[in-house]
Amino acid sequence: MASVADRFDCYQKSVQTPDHEVVFFEQAYRDAYDSTPMDLREDFCGTFAICCDWVASKSKRTAIGVDLCSETLQWGRDNNLAKLKKSQQKRVRLIEQDVRKRNRPHVDVLAAQNFSFWIFKTREEVIEYFKIARSNLKSKGVMVMDMMGGGECYEEGLVDKRKIVKGKKGFKYHWEQMSFNPITADASFAISFKFADGSKLKRAFEYHWRFWTIPEVREMLAEAGFSESHIYWENDDDDRDDDGYSSWERQEKAPSDASWICYIVAVK
C-alpha cells in the first residue's frame, strides 16, 4: 500500500484540521478587534487547505497562499482548489515565493502554522520574518502561529503513533523525534505512515528546525514591532466544541505538561 500511497493526502488526514483553524482565526481576530476577519494570508501554505476552507466559509472572504515548493502547491491545486466552486476558486491567490517578501493586498490574519517558522534558526532571521509578516497585515491585523513544547518533545527516539484511518485501507501516523541538541536547540523530526498491510512510507516528511520557546518568540515579536502577543492554551477535554475539536483561551500561566501545543497570536 505504501507504494501507491499519496504522502500529501496522508499528511492532510493526519495533521491538518482546516475547518478548526478557520474557527480559531476568527476567535483570535475577534478577541483583538471585536470584528470578523475577511482576508487571510497563509505563509508556508503547502497544499493550502486552510486557504480553501477560509474562502468556503464566507462568500466574500479572500485567501493568499505563499510557499516555495511548486510540487506541493500543484497538489493543492489538483486536490483542494479543484473541489471548490468556481466563484470560491477565484478568491484564492497562490504565490510561489519566499515568505520573507512583502505583498499586497494586506490581510486581516496572517498564519504560519505547523511550527513552520522554526526553519529560521537565528534571532535575526526570525525577527526579519516577523517584521515582514507584520508589514503584510492591515492596520488591524493579527499573526497566528502554533507552538509545541514539554519535556517529552526533547526525547530523542520518541515516536508518537496514532491510527488515522481504520480498516483494510487504514494507516497510522508516526511522529518521530529524531534528534535534539540542547546546546544549539537544533531539532530534527520526521513523519512516517504505516499501512494495514505492514508497508511504510518511512520519513515521508522531515523537518530540521530550531526549537524555539514561547518567551523567545514573544520577545522577538515585540522587537519586530507587534504591539502585544497572547498565548492561547488548550482547554480540558470536557470543553471540546460540537465537532470534537479543542477549545482555546488566553492564558498567562499553564501546567508543565509532558507535551503540549498552543497558539501565539501577535496583534499589530
Describe the predicted segments one by one.
Residues R100-L110:
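A short acidic, Gly/Pro-enriched loop at the edge of an enzyme's catalytic core
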Residues V144-M220:
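SAM-dependent methyltransferase
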Residues L84-V99:
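Conserved SAM-binding strand-loop segment of SAM-dependent methyltransferases
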Residues E125-S139:
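A short glycine-rich, Lys/Arg-flanked "PGG" loop and its adjoining helix->strand segment in the class I
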Residues H208-K268:
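C-terminal lobe and adjacent flexible extensions of AdoMet/dcAdoMet transferase-like proteins
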Residues G76-R77:
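Conserved SAM-binding loop
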Residues T36-G46:
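Conserved class I S-adenosyl-L-methionine
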